[in-house]
From Swiss-Prot:
It comes from Histophilus somni (strain 2336) (Haemophilus somnus). Gene3D superfamilies: 6.10.160.10, Ribosomal protein L20. GO terms for molecular function: rRNA binding; structural constituent of ribosome. This is Large ribosomal subunit protein bL20. Belongs to the bacterial ribosomal protein bL20 family.
Length: 117
């Protein structure tokens, strides 16, 4: 059986890592050992932040809904409680969109929540 030298495989692996590290600053985009660590860390950040993104968007929606409900003389928690009692099943993402882009419809929802309390 012929001897296989690993130069081709190592070169391919190095190229793959350096391609992933393209755009990084300094040695992180040029030196394999540093680039490899940077790519691993970037993957960890990406994994963590894919989960955090969901939390952050929910926080943003709640902040927007809260601001809009307070303009209509109601707190966020009472508004959500009123909607549940009025059996209005609109999620926070849609409520935030309505609060930003359709003030009249949002005011109607606030009135409906107030009447259900």
């Amino acid at each position: 059986m012929a001897r296989v030298k690993r130069g081709v495989i190592a070169r391919a692996r190095h190229k793959k890592v350096l391609k992933a590290a393209k755009g990084y600053y300094g040695a992180r985009s040029r030196v394999y050992r540093v680039a490899f660590q940077a790519v691993i860390k970037a993957g960890q950040y990406a994994y963590r932040d894919r989960r955090q993104r969901k939390r952050q968007f929910r926080q943003l929606w709640i902040a927007r809904i809260n601001a809009a409900t307070r303009q209509n003389g109601l707190s966020y928690s009472k508004f959500i409680n009123g909607l549940k009692k009025a059996s209005v099943e609109i999620d926070r993402k849609i409520l935030a969109d309505i609060a930003v882009f359709d003030k009249v419809a949002f005011t109607a929802l606030v009135e409906k929540a107030k009447s259900a309390l």
